[in-house]
Amino acid sequence: MFKNAKEFVQYANKLKTLREKKLNGVSIYVCVGTGCTAKGALKVYSAFEEELKKRNLLGQVTLEKIDDDKVTLNRTGCCGRCSSGPLVKIMPYRFFYSNVAPEDVPEIVDRTVLKGEPIERLFLTDPLTGEKVPRIEDTTLFKNQDFYIMEAIGESECDSIEDYIARSGYESLVKALTSMTPEEIIETVKASGLRGRGGGGFPTGLKWEFTRKAQGDIKFVVCNGDEGDPGAFMNRTLLERDPHLVLEGMIIAGYAVGAQKGYAYIRAEYPFAVKMFKKAIEDARKLGLLGENILGTGFSFDLEVKEGAGAFVCGEETALLASIEGKRGMPRPKPPFPAQSGLWGKPTLINNVETYANIPRILRDGVENYRKRGTENSPGTKMFSVAGPLKATGIIEVEFGTTLRDIIYNICGGFVEGEEFKAVQIGGPSGACLSEDFIDMPLDYDTLKKADAMVGSGGIVVITKKTCMVEVARFFLDFTKRESCGKCVPCREGTMQAYNILEKFTHGKATYEDLKTLEHLSKTIKTASLCGLGKTAPNPILSTLKLFREEYIAHIEGECPSGMCTAFKKYVINPDICKGCGLCARSCPQNAITGERGKPYTIDQEKCVKCGLCASKCPFKAIELV
């Protein structure tokens, strides 16, 4: 435990030297983020451990002691290229291997670890050029990004406080506690122009200032890690790969606003993120960076993790606070805002995971360094999770002002064969769908707001021409109606009724009157709902009505332009292929298929519910959806 800042600085300098020595030796880094783990990364890690032990090559894994002539095996966090995992990086050669299987491990040890030879078949494929590239930093995927908070890709240890300190970790905390007043810290954050990364984009420095000036002897700091958007996993990635970065930001925030206690509210569905953050808290306490009298400065601050039960509405700050208090997660009207009356009625600062992660580097590298990225009103970078039929998907970090075209084509490599661009859904289930007209629009808070869209937490779903936009709206509204807390009528009842109307569209039963009702109802929900969930729930409907209205009209006229909605199609049996085996008839739950054995069967369209079971059972592929 460090008694003062001087002891910490001496320790940090020692660790920096040791880490440099380690990276110059042979080190293996296996990505154990959730994406790679789902594809077998832990088995790959175990295979390396077993192989190195068998050859007596496994060295000490901490920076405190590095065994010469040995190989260090490390767990690293998400590298961003989740679609190519499991990922492995070999230092000092910087070879970056993708889709690694346990069976590849002996060859990697033989050729790369012992001889320094590359294995070309394991190289990462550049999504833009299609070429095999030995090092991730040489790919267009990497070059077209700006890793401001996602530093040290593939060569940091997600479970080591020593590694974080060796990467200049906690230096900003030392600087804040020993040479800055709380007011100076807040002014620095205000000058940086940092805006909340949780979706609203409220100026972070102003929020800190409000909390600092709020009356009260007891104050709290809360981290909103309740990332509930389908397909969004930026917060999870940060908490898994660099938990101390978020923790350091929270401690600095506690000092700046005058708080004594903090809570990290993390989804229970993120078990690895919860585990990493709890370990980070424990390790920081052991070194005296958290708890009583931090670094002998007289400042005391402690943290604990509160696991969320999974309700999407708990991403709303007042619902989140209610959940921490042990109550049902339900939003309340504002004002008073949490900065005035939050946890147990005390002034409370709430920021997103990514917001806190920016703080240490802003204090360490300065405001000018931060503001050279992004745009005037949206400085800095933003992490996005990109999903869809692209050549590369996963987590990216880009400057604000980057266009959708850059993300889709210059970073993710464009579409897989047979797919064409149609739209982008940005901002999660509460976000908007944007057409191709917006593909060159800079992504920042103000520009997206003008387009009736939002950054949200950073989820980007790329949609192709094979997808029905009415179905997209129905899908997202199905999610938000289920996640409504039920407190206010516009959200509880309105989303249900809007969903029922969308069901009529996708089932071929909608009328022009339904179209009129849907639009009016959506605007009413947006205006009259109590909290952000209800106010933004109709966004997918309103944006698709605005930009893809012709698809709604086509559904009324009896056609789904994308061919996705099966209600506008029918299953038919091709008499030239059908052998008359009767297997389809026996599998039909509606008894809609009849015929004489040995002759072609037919389907009664009045009885058919288009379940597709008959087509899946037919061994001759005689049943088609037309």
Swiss-Prot record:
4Fe-4S ferredoxin-type domain residues: 569-598, 599-626
Residues the record lists as binding NAD(+): G198, G199, G200, G201, D229
EC main group: oxidoreductase
Pfam families in alphabetical order: 2Fe-2S_thioredx, Complex1_51K, Fer4_21, NADH_4Fe-4S
Subcellular localization, as worded in the UniProt entry: Cytoplasm
Cofactor(s) needed: [2Fe-2S] cluster; [4Fe-4S] cluster; FMN
Record text on cofactor binding: May bind 1 [2Fe-2S] cluster per subunit. May bind 3 [4Fe-4S] cluster per subunit.
Entry binding sites for FMN: 207, 224-228, 312-317, 350-352
Superkingdom per UniProt: Bacteria
CC annotations in GO: cytoplasm
Binding-site positions, [4Fe-4S] cluster 3: C608, C611, C614, C618
Listed GO MF terms: 4 iron, 4 sulfur cluster binding; FMN binding; metal ion binding; NADH dehydrogenase (ubiquinone) activity
SMART domains: NADH_4Fe-4S (SM00928)
Keywords in alphabetical order: 4Fe-4S, Cytoplasm, Flavoprotein, FMN, Iron, Iron-sulfur, Metal-binding, NAD, Oxidoreductase, Repeat
Similarity annotation: Belongs to the complex I 51 kDa subunit family.
Subunit structure, interactors included: Heterotrimer composed of HydA (alpha subunit), HydB (beta subunit) and HydC (gamma subunit). Near neutral and acidic pH conditions favor oligomerization of the heterotrimeric holoenzyme.
Cited function: Catalyzes the oxidation of the physiological electron carriers NADH and reduced ferredoxin, coupled to the production of H(2). Acts as a bifurcating [FeFe] hydrogenase, which uses the exergonic oxidation of reduced ferredoxin to drive the unfavorable oxidation of NADH to produce H(2). The beta subunit contains flavin- and NAD-binding sites and is potentially the site for NADH oxidation, with the subsequent shuttling of electrons to the alpha subunit.
Protein name: Bifurcating [FeFe] hydrogenase beta subunit
Organism for this UniProt entry: Thermotoga maritima (strain ATCC 43589 / DSM 3109 / JCM 10099 / NBRC 100826 / MSB8)
